[in-house]
Amino acid sequence: FADKVKGILEMYLGGQNIGTAEKALLFGEANPSGKLAETFPEKLSHNPSYLNFPGNMDDVDYAEGIFVGYRYYDEKGINPLFPFGHGLSYTTFEYSNLTVSENEIKDDKTLTVMVDVTNTGDRDGMEIVQLYVSDKESSVRRPVRELKGFEKLFLKAGETKKAVFHLDKRSFAYYEPDIHDWFVEYGEFIIEAGSSSRDIRLSTSVYVSSDTKLPVHFTLNTTCGEINSIPEGRAMFENILSQIDCGFGDTASDDLGASAKEMMEAMIRDMPLRTLVTFTNVPDITRAKMSEMVENLNEMLAEK
């Protein structure tokens, strides 16, 4: 019936005087301003825990990891019945002038975010402004967006107020097991202001950097792509590629050969270093030489 009515009043656990509150809202004596603190899926099977709950005997597997609630529906591209943060009002609100205090900050600093909200209707009302952050260039899997703050503003009809948010290191960080702490990866972060997780009104961006370095230690089980991911390892990766090219001959003499070379390089990026030793037509790549290159690279990184 949800698509056949103009509105649904969700009262949750309203308490002893819930009837008085319902009357005030239904007859327009008060303006509703609540927002959903959860996602309402269209089907039970859309729930992120559908395949794992209630588990096996006494064990429950929380396989959804960090992708719970709106994070799961955003990642999967599933349209929910009602999204996280959704809520209607008897008036309307317009968002404008989303600004950040800095365009680039260090992770030990605090970023101030401000957005103007205007009551564009003819009734007084309250709006809950939601602020989401997204890591645009993350090397680890993170949610499409994460709620990092919200502000409730009371606005008279036609009035404009400013919602102010303060984002610290935790607002941009993810938990990194290698350092047993929260870690901010350098890159661009998208700042979004919206009325719900699916009703994003404005966005801007900021670059965040950190002096914290993740420990790096390579072995023969490290892939060539991981070696190539850091500046110190790129020379080693290029050396490996050049030796393989020599072993296989000139693979780039025509368009077909160029495609084959590109495909081989992509394949090599996913190979552990120990696998390269099996290339019998590349005699210069031996286990001993690979071990020496890895040891030299680790020593170089340790000196930094």
Region annotations inferred by a language model:
Residues 243-304:
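Extended, compositionally biased non-globular segments
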Residues 1-124, 186, 192-193:
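Secreted, periplasmic, or luminal enzymes acting at the cell surface/secretory milieu
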Residues 46, 67, 76-77, 89-215:
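Intrinsically disordered, low-complexity Ser/Thr/Gly-rich stretches
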Residues 12, 29-30, 40, 74, ...:
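Sec/Tat-exported extracytoplasmic proteins
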Residues 18, 79, 120-126, 198, ...:
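Intrinsically disordered or highly flexible coil/loop and linker segments, enriched in small
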Residues 209-229:
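Low-complexity, Pro/Ser/Thr- and charge-rich linker/hinge segments at domain boundaries
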Residues 101-104, 168, 219-226, 259-267, ...:
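Short, solvent-exposed coil/turn linker segments
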